[in-house]
From Swiss-Prot:
GO terms for cellular component: cytosol; Golgi apparatus; late endosome; membrane. The lumenal domain contains two regions of approximately 650 AA that exhibit 20% identity. The cytoplasmic domain may serve as a Golgi retention/recycling signal. Keywords: Glycoprotein, Golgi apparatus, Membrane, Protein transport, Receptor, Repeat, Signal, Transmembrane, Transmembrane helix, Transport. The keyword Electron transport does not apply. This is Vacuolar protein sorting/targeting protein 10. Functions as a sorting receptor in the Golgi compartment required for the intracellular sorting and delivery of soluble vacuolar proteins, like carboxypeptidase Y (CPY) and proteinase A. Executes multiple rounds of sorting by cycling between the late Golgi and a prevacuolar endosome-like compartment. One of its GO terms (biological process) is Golgi to endosome transport. It is found in: Golgi apparatus, trans-Golgi network membrane; Prevacuolar compartment membrane. It comes from Aspergillus oryzae (strain ATCC 42149 / RIB 40). Its main location: Golgi.
Length: 1488
């Protein structure tokens, strides 16, 4: 019996010993490693589970349900997932759902943590440039899937949606910028009771109504998946109005952010909303945001964090934090470190409010100058970024590698383990290279640090920080280090294989005792990988109890006491570092403990923004005092302080600060002196004798700020600058002799000021500062050549044409290139005439395409060749060997060269792609045996208007205007005998902003002109882009109410009685166009009523407000005019006679008021305003004589901003409102006002509305109707020409186009269409009706079976067939603000009047002072010739001092639209005939 008892006790002891040994092991358990053949591309845990998904680069999806111990390949129900998973995405708000996307249209979803997968089909490749999946923050069953189809740089995003986890899928809509849910995050609008209203709302970035270019994109929304209204409703982003140029949207916690950018500027506007209804533009404390130059950082529940790039060259930024509604941002810290991908060294410590780690650049000035590398230092904030301090380890400053040097997946420094922070870094003055650093750890949330292990390591936290592991991150390793006491002591465990570690991870909440380590067996990290699962469960024998925890304060103040943030202190119950236990609460996140604090000043924010001293708040709008108060200006009343408690702040009000209580305010604060109904005048007497040129630096609609900047060059070559439209002037470069000014045509804040030497100055901040620069050579001495050329995309890429060898007797022009900011000038080509970048958004692979005219054999006696190159002339191709000139107009490159068979005659050739040229085919009814001159007119409607000189007799110049097809090669006659002058300018002008409207003057007595009889001109107008023309209908009465001297037929012009207008060829200031791109439908002109155009002395001033359908006489005599506030103000001043009054109209010319601006009469030389005609300020350029001064140069600023009290209110949904009505242009020749397959509708302010437009861009309300197709929507196909009856017939001798070519080019094409002789014009949007281009379809070879299935053109096909060409062509009349520098116009190719010798002989002065490609119509309208000649290339340079006008005067008046015009030149009487401005290459800037 005793023996049995001893045996029993022995067994029990052995069992207990065995059990104790099992309870505590000496090292973690490492499961047998799993080998996989391919590199992992992504890995994630389903939250609060041990289930892991891993995607490999070969398309396999692996699943583990035991935290990585074992893995299996997911094949799907039918094996279709194997090798077909392109990428995986976890649902961010539902831990049961994930998505596997395939490359071939088949995708999969799981709703049970990858136990089962259901497939769904969307025949789209997942989007790469946009989010492929967009998740709903409130309903996890709602997901948007996005695929994209791209053609060159243009992409169409197709967004599909599901409301039932992809059991059903429907098309949401096509867009250009993708779609997103309004509720993009669970916190969005959660406290606003909007759940029902916005639960189905989605936003999409869609193309402009007329142009699919980024600057025209719109943000629309729908609450019913675009079912009820396919177009959706435009989002009112700014002051209740839509905004064009929206690039993208993003959901950031409780905010939605939209970014918009206008053409002509890199500046972005960020708009923010917290309720998906009310949006505000974010302000950044004076900083500007640029595209690809800001990063949305991890933000709090109550503010946004944004890092703004301030130094593109060196990668530094400024960190900003917003107020609670995201509208006003305060600067936190400067010189933050960024990389070229926009990643910022910034991380919030997980789980603890207010602690932020950032890296900054210690030596920003040296880095910016390029003389030193970055010296990076680390800083930490414990008060939400208000203040920063160094990290400390053993009394030294510590610096850590951060996001820009990310070496692992997940967060960089922290995890949900309370207070545990790790990083790779070093102590000293600044951060060293990664390999020279060590692993540091902090267990007090970054207050103090200690070195944990030498050398860099990958690391991870587990069991709420009770376990920390680290794997050395250099070379091959075969062990894992771990610590159980917050990194004080370390142990290690061996691995079976030596690996190059790529990932170290655990559950997202860091509560597990299990870790996964992934490594490659090869240093290249390709091919075979090993997965280790490490389990620490057996290292402690017990679970922590209450005494093992401490109440740990998450934040401490400067005195080491718990600190308050957002009205409370934060604590955690945290395991003590030396506790011999594990927390072992798997998947249970540590819970913070909050203790409320009394309110302090830090718990309040300004409703708008702080005052400059930071002590108070700016009130955003004038205060309204209580009724009965403010009987006197000096009275006081109780009003708001401007402060508010930060939403979500939990501070205790009793006994605390109360900054939001009402304060005593002066009644002066409640007045608004700027809206007192008065016009204000500011006179400035300038020291200069006169002005030679002036240039407006127009702000684009996405630009911040409100300055109205003008750079004026005086007759003494001194520079004057004003930022307030002439109210004050300054001389920033006093003593410097500036001879030329160039405005950057693609960046409206940039200007270059040149001298006659190598020295120059430039500004990139709108003339606030000027920096010197050194050119590679003095400017070319050929004053008709432009010195600078600019790249449309790479804004810092420049071409300089300089004078070389001028002291040796062989003075010629060489071209140099600067490839980017900070780069040196490099030689490009010698003996050149003109060099230009030919990169265009619509021209594939053209980024480096450059055209140059070069003299053959590098001799000025040689023929002029046209060369092209894609590698900056390391290699080049000769396009033409005997070119007269070339120019770019919209998408066309048009070249004038000598006919080989007849050198005295010219030939025009055209290219769209910049590679292949086709000879222009003139219509049979335009017979000009010797073609000596062309003028290429504006081409904004995807067709070239070309004036061909038929008579060049001095004083008798005229010729037909012909219009091309969409590739610029085949022409039809538009109108005959159009007037031109001896300089090549043509009386042709398109009405800006209106499709298809143009005005010309024709010679009515052609037969008599050949007999030296003076020309008799008649004015005609077209409303359908040149297809039909009519005489202008005259008004019934003149300005005095009297009848005209001819019989007026109401509403109709007759041969004996019609209105005739003085056109471009007669203008004193060629920039004064009839129309304005922002004042849609308005035109003003000087002319007369009769049977032909009379002399200037008989001229009166006329206006139309319906696009030229009807006209009204405004004033007797000749007046100059300007439009303001998009046409709601019109100011006129007498031309060529002294005055002290102006006349103005506030109702589109219906009534006129007189205003006296001066006590004495002055002579007005010019009147100007901002090029977009959106300002309320006008500037009179005058000469003043009074008792104090005699004949003094002066400017008068006339400010109308006080005339009206408020901005107009617009309801986009209703169209008509109290302030606006919907206006539809009339096209009298077209049925239902249809042109290009649609009718348009515009918002126009009611003339009676007492408010301001305050709109930087005119806005198309809608394409009112898409019309049915007619013959007018088709043109003749290639190799076909129009016949007398309007039909298209094959050109004799030419073959039919090979329709089957499409099958050869694209093997996937199923069918082709037999040619019919017609093709749809690119800009039409017509639907249905006449179908002339598709009669007979046939199957492609070997596609007969597929052909049997009916195929219609796809959505994207329709898009690119109908809409994309508009990107190239643009709709007529893009608003002033986005057209540039003489970019529209006439390109004159050819002769000079009055020469007796052969026009094209070598000795002809025309070749010596050669010939022009003249560009004319400014913006989409006017006939401002762009004379592109070998003597003049839009030179901003030559200054004519005699008339006070220089050649290069972009932005000088309404005629000089900022983004629509640039180098506008006056004609100097004694100069040779060929003048020019930059080629018209920006015509695509059409309205949204």
């Amino acid at each position: 019996m005793i023996y049995r008892w001893l045996l029993l006790v022995s067994c029990l002891l052995l069992a207990l010993l065995a059990q104790r040994g099992a309870a505590k092991s000496s090292s973690p358990k490492i499961a047998p490693p799993t080998k996989i053949d391919h590199k992992p591309s992504s890995l994630f845990y389903f939250e609060d589970t041990d289930t892991v998904l891993m995607n490999t680069v070969n398309g396999d999806l692996l699943r583990s349900v035991d935290a990585g111990e074992t893995w299996s390949v997911v094949e799907g129900d039918d094996g279709g997932m194997k090798h077909h998973v392109l990428l995986i995405r976890q649902h961010p708000y539902d831990n049961k759902k994930a998505y596997a996307l395939g490359p071939n249209g088949r995708h999969w979803v799981t709703t049970d943590q990858a136990k089962t997968w259901a497939s769904f089909n969307i025949a789209e490749f997942p989007a790469i440039r946009h989010y492929p999946l967009v998740f709903h923050g409130g309903d996890s069953s709602k997901v948007i899937f996005q695929g994209e189809e791209c053609a060159g740089r243009y992409c169409i995003v197709r967004s599909y949606y599901t409301t039932d986890d992809f059991a059903t899928v429907k098309l949401l809509r096509e867009s250009t910028g993708g779609c997103a849910w309004a509720v993009g995050h669970p916190q969005f609008a959660e406290d606003l009771n909007l759940a029902e209203e916005i639960k189905d709302r989605s936003f999409c970035v869609v193309p402009g109504l007329k142009v699919p270019l980024p600057h025209a994109n719109r943000l629309v929304y729908s609450d019913d998946y675009f079912k009820g209204n396919a177009e959706g409703t435009e989002t009112k982003l700014q002051e209740g109005r839509p905004v064009s140029g929206v690039i993208s949207t993003a959901a950031v916690k409780k905010f939605i952010v939209a970014a918009a950018k206008s053409k002509g500027t890199e500046e972005l506007a960020l708009y923010v909303t917290v309720d998906a209804k009310n949006w505000h533009r974010a302000e950044f404390d004076g900083h500007r945001i640029e595209e690809d130059a800001y990063t949305m950082l991890e933000s709090t529940n109550y503010s946004l964090q944004v890092d703004v790039l301030t130094s593109p060259r060196s990668g530094m930024g400024v960190l900003f934090t917003s107020n609670s509604n995201g509208t006003y941002f305060t600067r936190n810290i400067e010189h933050t470190n960024r990389n070229s991908e926009g990643m910022v060294d910034f991380e919030k410590i997980a789980g603890i409010q207010g602690i932020v780690l950032v890296n900054t650049v210690q030596n920003p000035e040296e880095v910016e100058s390029g003389s030193a590398k970055k010296k990076i230092t680390s800083r930490i904030s414990f008060d939400d970024g208000r203040t920063f301090q160094p990290l400390k380890s053993d009394g030294e400053n510590l610096h850590l590698h951060s996001v820009t040097a990310l070496r692992n997946i997940g967060r960089v420094f922290s995890s949900p383990a309370p207070g545990l922070v790790m990083g790779i870094g070093n102590t000293g003055n600044h951060l060293q290279e990664y390999a020279e650093c060590n692993l540091y750890i902090s267990d007090d949330a970054g207050v103090t640090w200690r070195r944990a292990i030498k050398h860099p390591h990958k690391y991870e936290f587990g069991d709420q920080g009770a376990v920390v592991i680290a794997v050395r991150d250099e070379g091959r390793v075969d062990k894992i280090n771990y610590s159980l006491d917050h990194g004080k002591e370390w142990a290690s465990v061996e691995l079976q294989h030596k690996i190059y570690p790529t990932m170290v991870t655990t559950t997202p909440d860091s509560t597990s005792l299990k870790f996964i380590v992934v490594g490659s067996l090869k240093e290249s990290q390709d091919g075979e990988h090993v997965i280790y699962s490490i389990d620490f469960d057996g290292l402690h024998e017990r679970k922590c109890e209450e005494d093992d925890f401490e109440k740990w304060p998450a934040r401490l103040d400067e005195h080491g006491k718990p600190d308050c943030l957002m009205g409370h202190k934060q604590f955690y119950m945290r395991r003590r570092a030396n506790a011999n236990c594990f927390v072992d609460e798997e998947f249970k996140d540590p819970q913070p403990i909050f203790e409320a604090c009394k309110c302090t000043a830090e718990d309040f924010e300004c409703e708008y923004r702080r005052t400059e001293d930071g002590k108070g708040c700016v009130i955003p709008s004038p205060l309204t005092p209580p009724e009965g108060e403010c009987k006197k200006p000096d009275d006081k009343f109780m009003g708001p302080s401007g402060w508010r408690l930060i939403p979500g702040d939990a501070c205790i009000r009793d006994g605390g600060e109360n900054l939001d209580k009402e304060i005593e305010r002066s009644c002066k604060d409640a007045s608004s002196p700027s809206t007192d109904g008065k016009i204000r005048v500011t006179l400035q007497l300038l020291e200069a004798r006169d002005y030679a040129q002036y240039y407006y630096l127009e702000r684009q609609s996405s630009s911040s700020g409100s300055d109205e900047t003008i750079i004026m060059l005086s007759s003494e070559h001194e520079v004057y600058v004003t930022h307030d439209h002439g109210k004050t002037w300054e001389r920033p470069l006093k003593g410097e002799e500036i001879t030329r000014v160039y405005l950057h045509p693609y960046s409206s804040d940039v200007a270059f000021l040149l001298t006659d030497g190598k020295e120059g100055f430039w500004t990139e901040d709108r003339g606030h500062t000027f920096k010197p620069f050194q050119a590679p050579a003095p400017p070319t001495q050929d004053r008709f050549l432009q010195v600078m050329a600019f790249h449309p995309v790479h804004k810092d890429r420049l071409i300089w044409t300089g004078a070389v060898d001028c002291h040796s007797g062989d003075c010629h022009s060489d071209a140099f290139i600067k490839k980017g900011r900070g780069k040196n000038w490099e030689p490009l080509l010698s003996y050149v005439q003109k060099c230009e970048f030919e990169s265009r958004e619509t021209r594939p692979n053209s980024t480096n395409l450059v055209y140059c005219e070069q003299f053959e054999k590098q001799s000025k006696n040689g023929r002029l060749q046209l060369l092209s190159s894609d590698d900056f002339f390391n290699d080049n191709e000769v396009q033409f060997v005997d070119v007269i000139n070339y120019a770019t107009m919209s998408e066309f490159i048009i070249v004038a060269s000598r006919q080989p068979e007849n050198p005295d005659s010219l030939v025009a050739s055209t290219s769209v792609d910049g590679r292949t040229f086709a000879r222009a085919q003139f219509p049979p009814n335009v017979q000009v045996p010797v073609q000596t001159a062309y003028t290429v007119l504006e081409s904004s409607t995807h067709a070239v208007f070309l004036h061909v000189t038929a008579s060049s007799t001095e004083g008798g110049e005229y010729g037909p205007i012909i219009k091309s097809n969409s590739n610029g090669t085949s022409y039809v006659l538009s109108i005959s005998a159009v007037n031109r002058n001896s300089l090549g300018y043509v009386d042709f002008e398109k009405a800006q902003g209106l499709e298809g409207v143009a005005v010309v003057n024709v010679v009515s007595n052609v037969a008599d002109v050949s007999k030296k009889v003076p020309k008799k001109l008649k004015t005609m107008i077209t409303h359908n882009d040149g297809a039909q023309w009519m005489l202008l209908p005259p008004p019934t009465k003149d300005a005095d109410g009297k009848s005209f001297g001819c019989s007026v037929v109401a509403g109709k012009g007759t041969d004996d009685c019609s209105l005739h207008l003085h056109g471009y060829t007669e203008r004193k200031d060629e920039r004064d166009t009839f129309a304005s791109g922002s004042a849609i439908g308005l035109m003003m002109a000087v002319g007369n009523v009769g049977d032909h155009l009379a002399g200037g002395d008989e001229a009166d001033t006329f206006i139309t407000n319906d696009g030229g359908i009807s006209w009204k006489s405004v004033k007797k005599g000749k007046y100059m005019w300007e439009y303001g506030d998009s046409g709601s103000v019109i100011v006129i001043v007498p031309e060529s006679k002294p005055t002290k009054t102006i006349h103005y109209s506030l109702d589109e010319g219906d009534t006129w008021e007189e205003f006296q601006f001066s006590d004495v009469e002055v002579r007005i030389n010019d009147i100007s305003t901002v090029p977009s005609d959106t300002s309320k300020n006008f500037l009179l350029w005058a000469r003043l004589s009074n008792s104090e001064v005699q004949d003094k140069f002066a400017t008068f600023n006339i400010d109308f901003s006080g005339v009206r009290p408020r901005p107009c209110l617009l309801d986009e949904n209703q169209g008509n409102s109290d302030d606006y009505y919907i206006w539809e242009p009339k096209h009298p020749f077209q049925e239902n006002n249809c042109l290009f397959g649609h009718s348009e509708q515009y918002h126009r302010k009611k003339p009676s509305a007492q408010c301001w437009n305050d709109w930087r861009e005119s806005h198309v309300h809608s394409i009112g109707t898409n019309c049915t197709c007619t013959r007018a929507d088709y043109e003749c196909d290639y190799n076909y020409e129009p016949q007398s009856d309007g039909s298209c017939a094959l050109v004799p001798g030419l073959p039919k186009p090979d329709a089957m070519e499409i099958c050869k080019k694209d093997p996937d094409t199923i069918e082709y269409w037999e040619p019919t002789g017609y093709r749809r014009i690119p800009q039409t949007t017509c639907q249905g009706g006449l179908n002339l281009d598709h009669f007979v379809s046939k199957p492609c070879p070997n596609k007969e079976e597929e052909y049997k299935q009916k195929h219609g053109i796809s959505g994207v096909g329709l898009f690119f067939a109908i809409v994309t060409p508009l990107a190239v062509a643009g709709a007529a009349g893009y608003y002033a603000y986005s057209k540039w520098d003489g970019k529209f116009g006439q390109i004159r190719l050819g002769e000079s009047a009055g020469t007796s010798q052969s026009f094209l002989s070598r000795d002809s002065w025309l070749v010596t002072v050669p010939i022009a490609i003249v560009a004319g119509t400014v913006a989409v309208a006017r006939a401002l010739p762009l004379l592109v000649t070998s003597l003049w290339r839009g030179a901003s340079g030559f200054i004519r001092l005699g008339r006070g006008r220089g050649y290069s005067r972009p932005y000088a008046s309404r005629g000089s639209f900022a983004a629509r015009r640039g180098d506008y030149t006056s004609i100097v009487d004694d100069e040779d005939e060929l003048l020019g401005v930059e080629d018209a290459e920006l015509d695509e800037d059409d309205e949204a």
